[in-house]
């Protein structure tokens, strides 16, 4: 990671590292370590960051919601720390553009892959913890996860838009939902798919993604935005 990129990611995170190698390792995918044998990669940091994130979110929810049961708190926490939520945090911070990975991984769409970006968030959290301590990383997590925490508390995080769309429409009885692949573009190793969701022969949402599944989920998400107003 060159000096410009290092300064840029520090500014994005709002963290200035005493040990720069920590953030460098946090943003190094295992494929890069396989290609360059001396390079450290982020899997161990990811392991630590997962526990740090769980602890900070758990303590926050425990102190904030004294009237909620263990089951309710567990459900809220699971929404905040799930892969989808971590991916949203990664996109907000543009982490994907800073992750070091092998050329092969990048050519197969690794830079946009949800799991790689979500894992990088956990590794970054570990890097901040090791460099700055628990108090600092707790503030860091609450700052960057604030929107996600509020969404989870208000039950606004949806993990499966297709299922939610189907459940919403079941209120009106038998309704036909179809997903139609409209087109795809790009080379085989980085192909983007475009899908319509058709409800009773009417296009209600258009989605795109780097897999057919992702495109269908995004189409369902758009349809939900249009339809939920009718059920409020």
Swiss-Prot record:
Classification via CDD domains: DSRM_RNAse_III_family, RIBOc
Record keywords, A-Z: Cytoplasm, Endonuclease, Hydrolase, Magnesium, Metal-binding, mRNA processing, Nuclease, RNA-binding, rRNA processing, rRNA-binding, tRNA processing
Gene Ontology molecular function terms on file: double-stranded RNA binding; metal ion binding; ribonuclease III activity; rRNA binding
Gene Ontology CC: cytoplasm
Cofactor: Mg(2+)
Catalytic activity: Endonucleolytic cleavage to 5'-phosphomonoester
Biological function: Digests double-stranded RNA. Involved in the processing of primary rRNA transcript to yield the immediate precursors to the large and small rRNAs (23S and 16S). Processes some mRNAs, and tRNAs when they are encoded in the rRNA operon. Processes pre-crRNA and tracrRNA of type II CRISPR loci if present in the organism.
Main enzyme class: hydrolase
Organism, as annotated: Clostridium botulinum (strain Eklund 17B / Type B)
Start and end residues of each DRBM domain: 160-229
Binding site for Mg(2+): 46, 119, 122
InterPro entries: dsRBD_dom (IPR014720), RNase_III (IPR011907), RNase_III_dom (IPR000999), RNase_III_sf (IPR036389)
Active site: 50, 122
A biological process term (GO) from this entry: regulation of gene expression
Family of this protein: Belongs to the ribonuclease III family.
Subunit structure: Homodimer.
Domain (RNase III) ranges: 6-133
Protein name: Ribonuclease 3
Designated gene of the protein: rnc
């Amino acid at each position: 990671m060159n000096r410009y990129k290092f300064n840029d990611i520090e500014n994005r995170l709002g963290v200035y590292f005493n040990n720069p190698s920590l953030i460098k390792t946090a943003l190094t995918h295992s494929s890069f370590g396989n290609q360059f044998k001396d390079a450290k990669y982020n899997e161990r940091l990811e392991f630590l960051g997962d526990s740090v994130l769980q602890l900070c979110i758990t303590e926050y929810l425990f102190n904030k919601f004294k009237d909620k049961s263990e089951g309710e708190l567990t459900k809220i926490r699971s929404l905040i720390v799930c892969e989808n939520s971590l991916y949203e945090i990664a996109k907000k911070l543009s982490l994907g553009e800073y992750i070091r990975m092998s050329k092969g991984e990048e050519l197969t769409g690794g830079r946009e892959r949800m799991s790689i970006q979500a894992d990088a968030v956990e590794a970054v959290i570990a890097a901040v913890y090791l460099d700055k301590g628990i108090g600092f990383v707790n503030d860091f997590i609450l700052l960057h996860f604030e929107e996600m925490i509020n969404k989870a508390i208000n039950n606004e995080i949806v993990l499966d838009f297709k299922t939610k769309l189907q459940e919403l429409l079941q209120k009106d009885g038998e309704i036909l939902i179809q997903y139609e692949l409209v087109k795809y573009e790009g080379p085989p190793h980085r192909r983007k798919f475009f899908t319509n969701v058709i409800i009773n022969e009417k296009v209600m949402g258009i989605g795109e993604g780097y897999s057919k599944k992702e495109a269908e989920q995004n189409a369902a998400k758009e349809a939900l935005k249009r339809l939920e107003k009718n059920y409020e």
